[in-house]
UniProtKB/Swiss-Prot annotation:
Its main location: plastid. This is Photosystem II reaction center Psb28 protein. The lineage of its organism: Eukaryota, Sar, Stramenopiles, Ochrophyta, Bacillariophyta. It comes from Phaeodactylum tricornutum (strain CCAP 1055/1). InterPro entries: Psb28_c1_sf, PSII_Psb28_class-1. Belongs to the Psb28 family.
Length: 115
């Protein structure tokens, strides 16, 4: 199974996100902020598929989900989706990183540390 992201269950998001990670100094918690610029979920034809119910990160291990999903509007039109996924334990961080590794491999993404 390929790693994928969905906002409506059963409908894969094709636009690749910009993902920013932060982690507490002791490594116990972390936050991933996803930004999708002009995602296909905002397309008028896609809107007929249903409502955005959250962000679902799906891979062979299962589903990670967050309900923290917001649209960004420019001149009254939706232009981007921002979603925040919070990891509350080192195990949750490790699980998220395994998902991102698979998602990156599937979509040709690379990880780079901030300088």
């Amino acid at each position: 199974m390929e790693a994928k992201i969905q906002f409506i269950k059963g409908l894969d998001e094709k636009v690749l996100p910009d993902v920013r990670l932060t982690r507490s100094k002791d490594g116990s918690t972390g936050t991933a902020t996803f930004r999708f610029k002009n995602p296909n979920i905002l397309d008028k034809t896609t809107a007929k598929e249903g409502e955005i119910t959250g962000m679902y990160l799906i891979d062979e291990e299962g589903i990670l989900e967050t309900r923290d999903v917001n649209a960004r509007f420019v001149n009254g039109k939706p232009e981007a989706i921002e979603s925040i996924y919070i990891m509350k334990s080192p195990e949750a961080w490790d699980r998220f990183m395994r998902f991102m590794e698979r998602y990156g491999e599937t979509n040709g993404l690379v990880f780079s540390k901030a300088s």
